Amino acid sequence: MTTATGTKPKKMEAFKMERGVKYRDAAKTSVIQVRNIDPDQELLPKPSWMKIKLPAASAKIDSIKHGMRRHGLHSVCEEASCPNLHECFNHGTATFMIMGAICTRRCPFCDVAHGKPLPLDPEEPRKVAETVQDMKLKYVVITSVDRDDLADRGAAHFAATVREIKALNPECKVEILVPDFRGRVEQAVEILKQNPPDVFNHNLENVPRLYREVRPGADYKWSLELLKIFKQEFPNIPTKSGLMVGLGETNEEILEVMQDLRDHGVTMLTIGQYLQPSRHHLKVERYVPPEEFDMFRSEAERMGFEHAACGPFVRSSYHADLQAKGELVK
């Protein structure tokens, strides 16, 4: 599979994507109608609380990467350039990204490649299950790229992956972090309920005012409806959602989204700082200080969330096993 990071096409209408090619950076954002991406922008300096020392390479990190490569699998940790990769891999956890590494959406905050994806690998659910067994994992997170090219948007592939993991690893807990299925939420839940997960996660990402810029192709109401319908179908399965801050939203808007999530039955919450993957992505408007994350967590508890992980480096699947146990993550 090749990667394209080239210069911006002269004319967008003349730009033809090739199937199976991963378009990143300038090649990806050149086809996004967002006006505030300036590759020559001055980057906001990172404050002291955002500076971390990455651990050295370890046998555990190499083992997880080898396990992924051996089965031709992908981790969102690597594909999305997560800042917690070394910590999580050293901890022996990884988030599997199914249905390939090419997304049909082109969200300008995300470092996952855009393009025309290849057909699904029907053996992938089994490969994921075998990798989970090889790694002796007790808790796994399964996420995916958006697959708007598929009739069911990938719901059946999620269900098959959960089924295969549970069949081979009956003691393993499975959390799925799903896309919005392009609004076909009732159809998706009907498929997913054949093999329900232990935790159902779908990220709202940010506030509705900024959706056109942050999540082109998504719809705030679709996402809330997906979370609501799944919770109605499975009232005893925790539902979870994540938000990024630092994109130009206000704290008041974040609190309103948190209340919307509670009103739709969501019981678990993650809030973390947005980090700009490259100059060809949305810029960081501000770095939210730790005390404001503490405020979000306090407000989440007041609203009735059963668990809220809020902190600069928190991501949706960051220490997901500890989140599911109700332990403090920040």
Swiss-Prot record:
InterPro entries in alphabetical order: Aldolase_TIM, Elp3/MiaA/NifB-like_rSAM, Lipoyl_synth, rSAM
CC cofactor: [4Fe-4S] cluster
Gene3D superfamilies: Aldolase class I
The Radical SAM core domain, residue ranges: 89-306
Compartments, as annotated in UniProt: Cytoplasm
Pathway: Protein modification; protein lipoylation via endogenous pathway; protein N(6)-(lipoyl)lysine from octanoyl-[acyl-carrier-protein]: step 2/2
Amino acids binding [4Fe-4S] cluster 1: C77, C82, C88, S317
Stored HAMAP family: Lipoyl_synth
Pfam family, one: Radical_SAM
Cofactor note: Binds 2 [4Fe-4S] clusters per subunit. One cluster is coordinated with 3 cysteines and an exchangeable S-adenosyl-L-methionine.
A GO term for molecular function: metal ion binding
Binding, [4Fe-4S] cluster 2: C103, C107, C110
The protein, known as: Lipoyl synthase
SMART domains named in the record: Elp3
Keyword Oxidoreductase set for record: no
Enzyme Commission number, as recorded: 2.8.1.8
Broad EC category: transferase
Entry GO terms, CC: cytoplasm
Catalytic activity, reaction form: [[Fe-S] cluster scaffold protein carrying a second [4Fe-4S](2+) cluster] + N(6)-octanoyl-L-lysyl-[protein] + 2 oxidized [2Fe-2S]-[ferredoxin] + 2 S-adenosyl-L-methionine + 4 H(+) = [[Fe-S] cluster scaffold protein] + N(6)-[(R)-dihydrolipoyl]-L-lysyl-[protein] + 4 Fe(3+) + 2 hydrogen sulfide + 2 5'-deoxyadenosine + 2 L-methionine + 2 reduced [2Fe-2S]-[ferredoxin]
Coarse class of the protein's main subcellular location: cytoplasm
Keywords (A to Z) from UniProt: 4Fe-4S, Cytoplasm, Iron, Iron-sulfur, Metal-binding, S-adenosyl-L-methionine, Transferase
Family listed: Belongs to the radical SAM superfamily. Lipoyl synthase family.
